[in-house]
Each structure stands twice: as structure tokens, then as C-alpha cells.
Design a protein with these regions (language model features):
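Extended alpha-helical, oligomerization-prone segments that build pores/tubes and scaffolds
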Residues: 1-233
Length: 233
């Protein structure tokens, strides 16, 4: 009931995740409480929008997990009015697409250089926050949200259960892998058969070119060409 009736986005988001999983080899789901909907939500997060440190082996042991989010001006304002983010003036959105985003836009069939949305960096990190230090000197898990263009901190939230004596971080992300790799990321069909697809495309083009030349009724006749009998080209 919770997944099918209450969380209306669960099925379409999960289908999007499964479609991208086989190709890219990695896909993520984010499960969290949405202050606007006032309920739990489960959203698909593409691999390019989730950044982990080099050398991380899994989400549980990663020292930092950064979720790149994009919010319209109205969406961000609603969250500020709801008290989820600080009510500060960020100016107009000025988000220039990076190379990865431009390539993705090209694959989708359009060309873009700017995005009229705010880019927010939601960072799950262990932090020794001044004024809230742990007596044992241990960095505690927090969720920090920063607007990328202005580097403005919008929110800092505790990411552990207050009743947990060990103060372990709460995990909001689920990693789905297609074929296990040698590190954090897994392999997908693009990695496994991408080279064969390129080779097949090259061979097919060569066959088409050879067939075209063999069946083309034309050629060149030089001035000094010797022709025997009626063998006129």
C-alpha cells in the first residue's frame, strides 16, 4: 500500500532506474522524507549525479557522498518558506552546464549550455562542527546543502539518530549494480559489449561502401585509353 498507493512516484522512478542500470552498470535510489509532500519518497539518482571520493568501496564506508540536485527558483523558494533551507537571497540562477551535462544533452537530441535551475550540492559527510564537537573528538555525520554558484550554505542537519549511542550515519541512498567491478562502480552493457558494437558498426559501413562501389554503373575514361572492338565503356 505504501509503495503502490501513497508513494506514487515509486514505480516510474524504479522503472527508470532499471532501464539505466543495464546500460551504465550503476544506478542509485534516494529514500528520504520530503517536507513538501510530508511523506517518504523514493527517487532515481543517475550515477553522474552522485559523487563519492576516489577509493571508496561502498556507500556505507564512504567518507563523503555528494548528491547533485537541481531546483527551480519556485521549488527552492517553497523549501525556504517551509523552513527546510535558510531564507537567504541567492540571486537569479546562473548554472553553466559542465562537459558531462552537455554530452548527456547531446545524447538526448538537443544542445544546451545553461540550465535555468539552481544547482545544489547535498553533502553527506563526517564533520567536527565547531560548537557541537563530540567529547571524544570524533567527526559526526551531517548533511550539508550548498548552492554551487554562490557557495552559500543553505542547511546543516544532523544525520544520526539521537537515541543511537554510536552515532552512526543514516543511509539515504541505495546502490544498484549490474555486474560487480573492481572498485566502487560496477560494469554495464556499454562496458562489456561497447567495443563489439563499435567493431560491428565499422564492418557494416565497410560492407555498405564495398557494395555501393561494386554496383555503381560509372567510372572514368582517360584520353589515352585503348579500346578493342566495340568494348566502349
Amino acid at each position: 500500500y505504501q509503495l503502490m498507493d501513497v508513494m506514487k512516484e515509486y514505480r516510474p522512478e524504479h522503472e527508470r532506474m532499471l532501464w539505466g542500470l543495464g546500460l551504465a552498470g550503476n544506478a542509485f535510489k534516494k529514500v528520504y522524507y520530503d517536507p513538501q509532500l510530508q511523506r517518504q519518497v523514493s527517487l532515481f539518482v543517475p550515477a553522474e549525479d552522485l559523487v563519492v571520493p576516489y577509493g571508496a568501496s561502498d556507500l556505507a564506508s564512504a567518507e563523503r557522498i555528494t548528491h547533485v540536485m537541481r531546483k527551480t527558483e519556485n521549488e527552492l523558494r517553497r523549501l525556504q518558506v517551509a523552513g527546510f533551507y535558510r531564507d537567504v537571497d541567492l540571486g537569479s540562477p546562473n548554472n553553466t552546464l559542465d562537459e558531462v551535462e552537455k554530452k548527456i544533452a547531446e545524447k538526448l537530441g538537443f544542445k544546451a549550455t545553461v540550465d535555468s535551475r539552481y544547482k545544489l550540492m547535498e553533502i553527506n559527510v563526517n564533520l567536527d562542527l565547531p560548537g557541537f564537537e563530540d567529547p571524544d573528538g570524533i567527526a559526526l555525520p551531517y548533511v550539508i546543502t550548498i548552492e554551487k554558484n554562490t557557495q552559500t550554505i543553505l542547511a546543516i542537519r544532523r544525520n544520526w539518530n539521537p537515541d543511537d549511542p554510536r552515532k552512526l550515519k543514516r543511509q539515504h541512498f541505495v546502490h544498484y549494480g549490474y555486474i560487480p567491478g573492481f572498485g566502487f562502480y560496477c560494469f554495464g552493457l556499454i562496458h562489456l559489449i561497447g567495443a563489439f558494437a563499435r567493431s560491428g558498426t565499422m564492418i557494416l559501413r565497410q560492407l555498405v561502401d564495398a557494395g555501393t562501389l561494386a554496383n555503381l554503373p560509372g567510372g572514368m575514361k582517360s584520353r589515352g585509353l585503348r579500346i578493342k572492338g566495340d568494348d566502349t565503356p
